[in-house]
Regions:
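Long terminal accessory regions outside catalytic cores
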Residues: 28, 64-72, 84-85, 92, ...
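Mid-chain, well-packed structural core segment of small domains
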Residues: 71-106
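Intrinsically disordered, low-complexity domain-flanking/linker segments in eukaryotic proteins
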Residues: 53-72, 101-107
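Extreme N-terminal segments of fungal proteins
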Residues: 1-61
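Well-ordered, non-membrane alpha-helical segments in soluble/globular domains
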Residues: 45-63, 87-93, 125-133
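Structured beta-strand/turn binding interfaces of compact recognition modules in eukaryotic regulators
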Residues: 14-16, 79, 110
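Ser/Thr/Gly-rich flexible loops in soluble cytosolic domains mediating phosphotransfer, phosphorylation
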Residues: 93-145
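Eukaryotic N-terminal low-complexity, Ser/Thr- and Lys/Arg-rich leader segments
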Residues: 1-9, 101, 143-154
């Protein structure tokens, strides 16, 4: 079991509804490990720098996730409720962590130009699982990620 976890890609998942977060977390296993599900841009901006340093945030907006902070996330993925300002806030928090060049996680935001069922519908979560797997597969293979704007690819 520990071996499967060590091979799973660690990520931080951000969204509005824990019911969707739980569904997506379970649907991404065993290849992708959700370290923590964060709710809201303010909490995420506060929590991610701790996660990047390998420690649990002192306060958490959610307790969904593996809680294993020993491997930094490869990506911070935000759901449909996140706008460009929220992305910028989290990006600034990541930059403030003072990571070595090239080690910061990629920030991905849901492409709202893609028609989806409305959250928290189960179908929304299923589509999100599929889209996250596709994008993270590209990332793992070193392929270029592209979307309608920077960071919007999921």
């Amino acid at each position: 079991m520990g071996n499967a976890r060590s091979k799973a890609m660690p990520i931080v998942l951000c969204g509005k509804a824990e019911v969707v977060g739980k569904q997506v977390l379970e649907g991404l296993k065993p290849d992708i490990e959700v370290i923590l599900f964060c709710q809201g841009s303010d909490p995420t901006a506060a929590e991610v720098p701790y996660i990047l340093r390998g420690v649990a945030p002192p306060t958490q907006s959610s307790y969904i996730g593996s809680g294993v902070y020993t491997r930094p996330p490869k990506a911070v993925i935000m759901g449909a409720a996140w706008d460009a300002n929220a992305v910028a806030q989290v990006k600034a928090a990541i930059q403030s962590a003072g990571l070595p060049a090239g080690t910061a996680p990629i920030i991905l935001r849901n492409d709202t130009s893609v028609v989806t069922p409305k959250p928290p519908a189960r179908e929304y979560g299923e589509q999100l699982i599929h889209r996250i797997r596709l994008v993270l597969g590209k990332l793992e293979r070193g392929e270029k990620l592209d979307g309608p704007e920077e960071g919007v690819v999921v």
